[in-house]
């Protein structure tokens, strides 16, 4: 395995260097991880930690355009993040809670950000509204104590798989499947795109990926 692939700890929550999903049987490497929070009455309150895992073919896909670029260049280039978001490879995103949140509390903010993005790019129609409703329904019975996680599995064909875990382990079954490419992309867009909820995660991706992109052939195998 590439030496540059290491685990990351965010607020005592560990993100392993490689994870294998029991849903797909595939392994994914950790692209980056970071905190997400809000400034409330002048204080920055950390709510969640987000880790973005990528299928190994992501390296070759991204290297075609971004090999040789520095971390500083990538951090300032929105197209780099958009290529992660829209790239023809699977992503597995783990959002683990630093503070307790109910499913509806958490999903409401995610949905607000997704809908705002979809409307801004003109891709919010009836199908997307229906997909967002399905998204909301999936979170209704869920509660997230500290350390609990949501997993978003994003496939290149636009399927978003949701699963919920009381800890950081990947569940064997998904709680919901949302078949809408625009909505699936919007979830990651709001995390690392133009109006990212986790600048920390964006910095981490830009810091870690250049070494991999410059290395060339990369396979984690399974």
Swiss-Prot record:
It catalyses: a chalcone = a flavanone. It comes from the Eukaryota. GO terms for biological process: flavonoid biosynthetic process. The keyword RNA-binding does not apply. The keyword Isomerase applies. PANTHER family: CHALCONE--FLAVANONE ISOMERASE 1A (PTHR28039:SF10), CHALCONE--FLAVONONE ISOMERASE 1-RELATED (PTHR28039). This is Chalcone--flavanone isomerase 1. It comes from Medicago sativa. The gene is CHI1.
């Amino acid at each position: 395995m590439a030496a540059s692939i290491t685990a990351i700890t965010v607020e005592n929550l560990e993100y392993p260097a490689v994870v294998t999903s029991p849903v797909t049987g595939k392994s994914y490497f950790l692209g980056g991880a970071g905190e997400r929070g809000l400034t409330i009455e002048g204080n920055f309150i950390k709510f969640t930690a987000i880790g973005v895992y990528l299928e190994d073919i992501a390296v070759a896909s991204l290297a075609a355009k971004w090999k040789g670029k520095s971390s500083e260049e990538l951090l300032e280039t929105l197209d780099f993040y958009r290529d992660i978001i829209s790239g023809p490879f699977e992503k597995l995103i783990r959002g683990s809670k630093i503070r307790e949140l109910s499913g509806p509390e958490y999903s409401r903010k995610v949905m607000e950000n997704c809908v705002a993005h979809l409307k801004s790019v003109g891709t919010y129609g009836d199908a997307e509204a229906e997909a967002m409703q399905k998204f909301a329904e999936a979170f209704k019975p869920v509660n997230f104590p500290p350390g609990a996680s949501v997993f978003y599995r994003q496939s290149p064909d636009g399927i978003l798989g949701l699963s919920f875990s009381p800890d950081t382990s990947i569940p064997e079954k998904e709680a919901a499947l949302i078949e809408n490419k625009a909505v699936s992309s919007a979830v990651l867009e709001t995390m690392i795109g133009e109006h990212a909820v986790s600048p920390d995660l964006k910095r981490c991706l830009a810091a870690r990926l250049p070494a991999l992109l410059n290395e060339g052939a990369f396979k984690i195998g399974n």
